[in-house]
Amino acid sequence: MTGRTVTVVGAGLAGAEAAWQAARRGIKVKLYEMRPEKLTPAHRSGYFAELVCSNSLRAAALENAVGLLKEEMRHLDSLVMACADVTSVPAGGALAVDRDLFARCVTERIAGNPLIEICREEVTAIPEGEAVIIATGPLTSDALASDISRFTGENCLFFYDAVAPIVAAESINMGKVFRSSRYGKGEAAYLNCPLSREEYEVFWEALVKAEKAPRKEFEKELHFEGCMPVEVLAARGKETLLYGPMKPVGLIDPRTGRRPYAVVQLRQENAAATLFNMVGFQTGLKWDEQKRVFRLIPGLEEAEFVRFGVMHRNTFINSPVLLHPTFQTRKNPALFFAGQITGVEGYVESAASGLMAGINAARLLAGKEPLVFPRNTAHGSLAHYITAADPAHFQPMNINFGLFPPFEARIRDKKERYRTVAKKALESIDRFKETLL
């Protein structure tokens, strides 16, 4: 055990996991949590790792990327996964928990660790320290957010998600789309889904009648200037989208030699070209409605949505500019960020990022080199996405197999292919774990 201390700010899923991982390696931890003295608009208790939305940690099977991420966490002795497994409730093919028992489990184990000192107070500025992990989540307090903005620069801290859906490339019907940029300028960077007048009118009718996701009370005053939901634009008139995200100007369908009546553009989301973003289609529709309505677009009839559109309050940094894949900041290697504030999306992803940051902060204080997790693992792919994505278009993301390196072996059956990816990932995690001892 060293006499050095990791300071962790925020005891949500990421902060609790980070503190646990550092303490497991013999490092003292000061864990700051402002609740219950000061509650966020979403939290209701002072328990650590409180689940404020769903009680589901999503799919359990290894052929699902989040199922693999959870299994990797188990191999790495995750506190969050240990508590989730002992407080689970029946949920079919998913892992769901009794949220009160889960939060109590995490809190009690943290409180029972002699190396972790709990400080129930608000942190209003980035602390000085030998190693500091900021894990304050999407509802970071105003005072601390202001100081983070000072550190990152005002253009590198965002306060809401306005995200368009992302689809898996292999699910796009390439026979119905064409690759082109407007007016043929530059490289043909976009996939274009052309719509006839009749197809557009069917799509528009479905869009304006689709059911919107309810806003939480603390999100009702959000305004998304310059980033209007596509359904709000559509409601302004039948032709509004034709002058906005579905404008066809400068595009010629090579199969007809004519300009389509309307076009939906898909922009490549990652270097491997496995993911495509629906340009300008940020939306607040319910997820089932997004699937139903957007599959009316030619070429997207069988689209697999790896990320649905969302519009909600979410404080996060521009990680591709600010972070190394070790979760250290580029400006200060003793300062780490973890959790949703880094641009990972979801309970499990937040905890996994805390696990990586906690391990690396402990290594830093032990005089060891912080480590980048293997690229072919769910942990490594998540870290790679948030630090290597295009900074100009960076948006929070759930783990999905589109973030992994392209799989070289040709396996037609998708489930079998993903099971093979998972097997290799777990083998890599087990080898990697030996370097952490």
Swiss-Prot record:
GO molecular-function terms, A-Z: flavin adenine dinucleotide binding; tRNA (uracil(54)-C5)-methyltransferase activity, 5,10-methylenetetrahydrofolate-dependent
Top-tier EC class: transferase
InterPro entries: FAD/NAD-bd_sf, MnmG-rel, MnmG-rel_CS, MnmG_N, TrmFO
Catalytic activity: uridine(54) in tRNA + (6R)-5,10-methylene-5,6,7,8-tetrahydrofolate + NADH + H(+) = 5-methyluridine(54) in tRNA + (6S)-5,6,7,8-tetrahydrofolate + NAD(+); uridine(54) in tRNA + (6R)-5,10-methylene-5,6,7,8-tetrahydrofolate + NADPH + H(+) = 5-methyluridine(54) in tRNA + (6S)-5,6,7,8-tetrahydrofolate + NADP(+)
Domain of life the protein comes from: Bacteria
Chief location category: cytoplasm
PROSITE patterns assigned: GIDA_2
GO biological process: tRNA methylation; tRNA wobble uridine modification
Residues annotated as binding FAD: 10-15
Cofactor dependence: FAD
Keyword Cytoplasm carried by entry: yes
Localization: Cytoplasm
Any Pfam family hit: GIDA
EC number, as in UniProt: 2.1.1.74
Keywords carried by this UniProt record: Cytoplasm, FAD, Flavoprotein, Methyltransferase, NAD, NADP, Transferase, tRNA processing
One GO location term (cellular component): cytosol
Family matches, as Gene3D superfamilies: FAD/NAD(P)-binding domain
Role summary: Catalyzes the folate-dependent formation of 5-methyl-uridine at position 54 (M-5-U54) in all tRNAs.
Family under the similarity heading: Belongs to the MnmG family. TrmFO subfamily.
Name recorded for this polypeptide: Methylenetetrahydrofolate--tRNA-(uracil-5-)-methyltransferase TrmFO
Organism: Pelotomaculum thermopropionicum (strain DSM 13744 / JCM 10971 / SI)
